[in-house]
Amino acid sequence: MSTNTALASRSDQPKRRGRPRKDVTAQGASVTTNPIAPHHVPSNITLDLNEIYTGNFIELAASLPDKSVDIIIADPPYNASKGNILSMQYGNLPGFGGAWQKIAEVWDDMPLDQYLAFTLSWLAEAKRLLKPTGSMWVHGTYHSAGITNVAMQMLEIEIINEIIWYKRNSFPNLSGRRLTASHETILWAHRGGKRAYNFNYEHSKEGDFSDDQLKVPGKQMRTVWDLPNNKPRNEQAFGKHPAQKPVRLAKRFIRLSAQPGDLCLVPFAGSGSECVAAKQEGLRFIGFETDPAYVEIARQRLNAIDEP
């Protein structure tokens, strides 16, 4: 089934659960400071749902209809590969569980103006695709979160919350020249305009968050999350990505802001954790990844999931 047909087939389904709200259309933003040139994409591209595509999100997603996506989970490049970011490769460094090597990925090392232009470009496309009732979750660190925040403001994308993901099991800082980086930033945002985004408020209070040492049962969820970054062996059975996130984190996003049957967009799919979470939670999904090797890993992970 093509994407357009699949999306149209949901128009007559009952409204989802959640706090009462009006269905309103968010006001679009015109940003004259956006330096991005438009992408020209053939109009004959047809994308199917529940698939990860090899290629550039901005180019391939141009064939998707406006306001067709319920939730976006984005883990874009942090632009952190400036010669000082370390990533563990299993090896023989005593006391730290492995040898440490610098990340040297081309996709994670851009001049500042180029990175801002890239961020504006993909966020503008994400906003176009997001429903007024939808929202997006965007990962970042101190290298990127500030730029993402500014880009959202330039595009009149409203930030709902800034979340601190505290990682108790963070790798130590080997240089002894700075504090150990033990958190990442997550921006939860909607497309702007009237606040019609879905929020499963009762779940945020009463859900099972036993893996979070800071969450108080029965109390409102706060914006500091204590979730371990370790991945179970089955999440890396077919290979791994240097910036791979645990599936449990994407499942939290989904349970807070989506419903079964919703469409989840993953612009930077990597090895597929967010798509795996979407499938396991009963969502439809569509993902994009530029590296064919990671696409293959992601597809193997998805194929290994038992159908409900």
Where are the language model's segments positioned?
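Arg/Lys-rich, glycine/proline-spaced intrinsically disordered segments
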Residues: 12-22
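Core catalytic lobe of class I
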Residues: 2-10, 27-34, 38-297, 307
